[in-house]
Every structure is written in C-alpha cells, then in structure tokens.
C-alpha cells in the first residue's frame, strides 16, 4: 500500500502505484473536516502544520503535527520546544508517506478502507434481534470505561467521550435491552466515516459488529454516499472488512513520542 510498491492488505485488497498517481483521495478531505470539528489548524513550518484541540489537549490525534514532507532536524527541535512551552508531554507526527528519518520514533499505520458504490450488502450477516438506536449516554460511558479506562485512564476516557459526542452521531447496538456495541459516524461531501467500533466481549460472535456496519452501509447507500472506515492493518477486523467488500485506498503513518529523552535529534 506504500506509494513505492503495492502491498496486499487482505484477500483481494491491494492498492497499486498507478492508483496513487492517478487518483485523488477524497476521504482525506472528509477526515480533515472531521478534525476541524474539534481542532484548529495553523502553519508551523515548511513541512509541518499544527492541529490543536484546546478543550482536549491530551488527545494525541487532535493535537498532532501533520507533515507534508520530511521535517528537518531544526523543524523537529522547534516542534519539541513548542510542545514543551505548552506543557504538552508528547509529540505526534502524522502524514501520508513514511518518514525517511523518524527521529527515533516508532511508526504505527492506519489503513483507510472504502466500500465501493454498488457493493451488494444484502448477503452480509446481521442479527435480527439487534436494534440500532442512539445509545443511552450513561451506558455508553460505562461501556467505553470498561475497555478504554484501563488503557487511557478513567478521567480521559470520560472527557474524550463527552467531547466527541457533542459533535458526532453515536449509534448503539442493543440486544436483550443491553448495549452490546457502539460506534460513531461523521458525514461530509458524499462520504460517511464510521469509527471507534466497540463490541462488548459478552456479546461476541452474535454479529453485533456486522449488524452495525450493515445498518450504516444501508443508510449510506440510500443517500448515495460512500462508506469508509479506518483500520489497523495488523488487526483481525481489517480482514473482516475486506471480506465484506471494503477496499484499502490510503494509509496514514503515525509517529508518537511520550518520552522526549528518546528522540534522536
């Protein structure tokens, strides 16, 4: 999936160099509009643009430096000094090509997968006993605390969820009167992004995820919109999405540092 070569990302899912050269990637525009719901953007240096969410300054994605090319050592030093001056104990860089010099930071990748228009979704498995509706927000918070609390801390998990749901549409999958799964969606410019899909482990193997995705896909197709999502290329859900017909069209490279002493500059 890198621009330099074609890499398979699942059964029948491959993006060629020709694709990159000849196709604009409209999901990037929708993703930028998503971030602008929460963050301001300002040019920082020749290769860096700073994204800032002053209501949730400890959320890495909302406060990253977006690079358009390889940052120089001086640019990274300036970015580091800027973060320190703000009192932000992290530095995140992200862009659509891998960095030749990552300054000692490890890279994580996120794949954008699109469901092509006209995809037949009638055969997707769904649980007829699952109802899809706006989740009860207390239940939603408890659901996210169960899984994200141990990873990110309870305080951040609650603040993050409340911040996001101010401007995003959350959908809950209910089975037996209980919240079994949830996700949020954002629509713009004929595209619908589905993200943060979370299924309670007590309801695994009951088609909660596919029922949610099918519901969203049906609504998108009714509107003539294109559904897409973001996936970790190493996780099992990516393979499930590929089997459902989603195709990989883009990849984001993300570099994070939370220990400035490890930076190589």
Predicted regions, residues:
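Conserved acetyl-CoA binding element of GNAT-fold acetyltransferases
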Residues: 59-69, 190-201
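Conserved GNAT acetyl-CoA-binding A-motif
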Residues: 85-94, 220-232
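A conserved beta-strand-loop-helix scaffold within acyl/acetyltransferase catalytic domains
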Residues: 154-198
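Conserved acetyl-CoA-binding loop-helix of GNAT-fold acetyltransferases
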Residues: 73-79, 199, 205-218, 243
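Short amphipathic alpha-helix that is part of the acyltransferase structural core
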Residues: 24-38, 60-67, 111, 121-157, ...
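Conserved active-site alpha-helix within GNAT-family acetyltransferase domains
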Residues: 96-106, 210, 233-251
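Acyl-donor-binding surface of acyltransferase catalytic domains
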Residues: 2, 12, 17-23, 68-131, ...
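N-terminal charged segments
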Residues: 15, 20-86, 153-154, 158
């Amino acid at each position: 999936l890198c621009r330099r070569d074609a890499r398979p990302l699942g059964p029948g899912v491959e993006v060629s160099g020709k694709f990159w050269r000849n196709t604009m990637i409209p999901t990037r525009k929708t993703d930028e509009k998503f971030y602008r719901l929460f963050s301001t953007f300002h040019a920082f240096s020749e290769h860096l643009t700073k994204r800032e969410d002053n209501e949730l300054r400890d959320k890495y994605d909302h406060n990253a430096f977006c690079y358009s090319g390889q940052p120089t050592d001086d640019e990274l030093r300036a970015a580091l000094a800027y973060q320190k001056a703000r009192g932000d104990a992290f530095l995140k860089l992200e862009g659509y090509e891998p960095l030749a010099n990552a300054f000692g930071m490890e890279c994580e990748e996120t794949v954008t997968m699109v469901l092509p228009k006209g995809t037949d979704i009638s055969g997707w498995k769904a649980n007829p006993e699952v109802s899809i509706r706006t989740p009860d927000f207390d239940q939603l918070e408890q659901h996210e605390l169960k899984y994200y609390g141990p990873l990110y801390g309870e305080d951040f998990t609650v603040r993050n969820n409340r911040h996001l749901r101010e401007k995003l549409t959350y959908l809950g999958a209910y089975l037996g009167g209980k919240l079994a799964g949830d996700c949020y969606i954002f629509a713009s410019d004929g595209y619908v992004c589905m993200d943060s899909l979370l299924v309670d482990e007590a309801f695994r193997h009951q088609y909660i995820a596919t029922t949610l995705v099918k519901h969203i896909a049906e609504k998108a197709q009714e509107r003539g919109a294109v559904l897409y999502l973001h996936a970790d290329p190493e996780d099992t859900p990516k393979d499930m999405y590929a089997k459902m017909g989603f195709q990989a069209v883009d990849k984001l490279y993300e570099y994070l540092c939370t220990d400035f002493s490890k930076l190589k500059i």
